[in-house]
């Protein structure tokens, strides 16, 4: 269990997921040396989870992926309280602003946005207490950031965050193994793991901003009623809310089907060099 939940992502293994006190964005490149098209992965540690299948896709298709990733920092323009630093993260605000500016200068064929939405919004999955934002503030902040990309003519794929388990999956599976109880003991009801309120709010934001497409991959993680801890013999989560790199590889094909039309569009030009 420990080994299967400890494999780092493509981006984090190269130090591309910035820490809490880092403010200056770092663009990391993956894929082809002379790419036909470039796309960007933008977000927090929940976006980092997707870097492994996306890096493999960039390699296989002759594309370039550029990542802009920072732990515990929302793409949505909101004040983010960092519980480790015990304060509002000024580093997050600086990083977000500069990362968006860098992406606009880069001019990619598409930007994929993923973030731990339920971690920032008031509700059962946030540890921020009174510092979590309400849904209206979140939606307005998300729309603000997406409109900056839209104004530059950059297509955006807004991906609904992966479902959030009710417990630390690695600990739960270890305990289940010790007690001799089935893995299903660690499953989470879909109604709890997937907030329909947040899903609907983010879909509405995407519909309000031209050039933004909302995508929900929840069915890759859950069946109609439950989100298992193990699917197809693969552990889905490495902790309370992050995907294992092994399971994230299952996202390669649906991500390819999603990106191909955008990357092959004649309307999207090749991006320039990183600055």
Language model features with spans:
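Extracellular/periplasmic envelope-modification machinery, especially enzymes
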Residues: 1-275
């Amino acid at each position: 269990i420990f080994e299967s939940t400890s494999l780092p992502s493509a981006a984090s293994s190269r130090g591309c997921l910035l820490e809490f006190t880092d403010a200056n964005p770092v663009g990391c490149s993956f894929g082809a040396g002379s790419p036909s098209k470039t796309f960007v992965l933008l977000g927090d540690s929940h976006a980092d989870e997707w870097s492994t299948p996306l890096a493999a896709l960039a390699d296989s298709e002759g594309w370039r992926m550029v990542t802009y990733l920072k732990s515990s920092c929302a793409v949505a323009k909101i004040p983010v309280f960092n519980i480790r630093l015990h304060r509002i993260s000024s580093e997050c605000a600086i990083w977000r602003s500069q990362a968006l500016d860098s992406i606009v200068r880069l001019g990619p064929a598409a930007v994929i946005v993923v973030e731990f939405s339920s971690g920032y919004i008031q509700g059962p999955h946030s540890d921020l207490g009174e510092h979590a934002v309400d849904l209206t503030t979140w939606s307005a902040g998300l729309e603000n950031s997406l409109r900056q990309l839209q104004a530059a003519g950059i297509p955006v794929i807004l991906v609904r965050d992966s479902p959030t388990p009710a417990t630390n999956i690695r600990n739960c599976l270890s305990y289940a193994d010790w007690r001799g109880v089935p893995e299903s003991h660690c499953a989470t009801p879909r109604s709890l793991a997937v907030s329909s309120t947040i899903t609907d709010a983010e879909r509405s934001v995407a519909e309000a901003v031209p050039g933004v497409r909302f995508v929900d991959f929840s069915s890759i993680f859950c069946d109609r009623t439950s989100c298992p801890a193990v699917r197809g013999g693969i552990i889905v989560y490495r902790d309370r809310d992050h995907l294992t790199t092994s399971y994230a590889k299952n996202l390669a094909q649906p991500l390819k089907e999603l990106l191909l039309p955008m990357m092959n569009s004649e309307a999207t030009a090749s991006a320039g060099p990183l600055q």
